[in-house]
UniProtKB/Swiss-Prot annotation:
It comes from the Bacteria. This is Uncharacterized protein BB_0007. InterPro entries: HAD-like_sf, HAD_sf. The lineage of its organism: Bacteria, Pseudomonadati, Spirochaetota, Spirochaetia, Spirochaetales.
Length: 285
């Protein structure tokens, strides 16, 4: 067996997949901002902007833009990347997440002398710094999520001694994740780097084969990634959608053959979700 075939990738969404709700709620609570008002405004942004001549709107970018408006207007006073990182410690994970990730870490230690390895990846439209500041960060190989700049480079920075702004609050978006990025990540993991995505890489030279890539997420924004594995790459058993409470959407995705399986967002040993993940590991390493 090719040694690359002994490496498996577990790709997780974050909000409502690993944690209760959206990570931004921690931020809203910390700064006493009404989350319902914020998200209601976000839902209306596209319509209002289009009414005023802004015709090309990215749904993911527009929420980040409105978030930065709140920062700029002082509702998230002095918010920078360090503050986001520190708030990550307050994120509340679903039952069993930390235990599962710790168990996977122990499995990897036992595999050190072999060519097998389990890698955990996070792909989220949430905030990367909060994920990096959370309890699971030590277990994760790489995080794709939205990233902000706080200290920005000044005009003519090449000629200046003080190249960065003195204002260190979040000021602009330098990376964002939408459903198209989520599908791209699958190929990036498969080929081993972003630079190789558009290159023709022989299967024998790819980092992780598609059959060893497993995708766990909660919602409709992940459907394109599900369908890449399910329909195009013919690995329907490699995808699973999770739910917390109401399983209506999860069942809908499953019965429409848009995802391979579904389970309650409980990662405790013995649950369906735990067993699904451990089965994939045992069959692949």
């Amino acid at each position: 067996m090719n040694e690359r075939e002994n490496i498996i990738a577990l790709i997780f969404d974050f909000d409502n997949t690993l944690i209760y709700g959206n990570m931004q709620q921690v931020l809203f609570d910390e700064y006493c901002v009404d989350s319902c008002s914020f998200w209601r405004e976000v839902e209306g942004l596209e319509y209002v902007y289009k009414q005023n001549g802004y015709n090309i709107i990215s749904n993911e970018m527009i929420y980040l833009s409105h978030f930065l408006t709140y920062v700029r207007e002082g509702f998230f006073e002095s918010l920078d990347n360090r503050a986001l990182f520190n708030l990550g410690a307050k994120l509340r994970f679903f039952e069993g997440v930390i235990g599962l990730f710790d168990e996977i870490s122990e499995i990897n230690k036992k595999l050190e002398n072999s060519k097998s390895q389990i890698k955990i990846y996070i792909v989220s439209s949430g905030f990367r710094q909060m994920i990096l500041g959370s309890k699971i960060a030590p277990y994760v190989s790489k995080v794709w999520a939205c990233e902000f700049i706080d200290s920005y480079l000044m005009p003519f920075y090449e000629l200046r001694d003080d190249k960065f702004s003195k204002n260190k609050i979040l000021s602009s978006v330098c990376y964002f994740v939408d459903h198209t990025i989520k599908t791209r990540v699958i190929f990036e993991i498969n080929k081993g780097s972003y630079e190789k995505i558009n290159e023709r890489v022989p299967k024998s030279k790819r980092q992780i084969p598609f059959k060893n890539i497993f995708y766990i997420a909660d919602g409709f924004s992940d459907v394109p990634a599900f369908e890449i594995l399910n329909n195009i790459l013919k690995h329907c058993r490699n995808t699973l959608t999770v739910y917390h409470g109401n399983d209506k959407n999860a069942k809908k995705l499953f019965y429409e053959n848009r995802v391979g399986d579904f389970a309650e967002a409980n990662y405790t040993k013995g649950t369906k979700l735990y067993n699904w993940i451990m089965e994939k590991i045992c069959l692949s390493v």
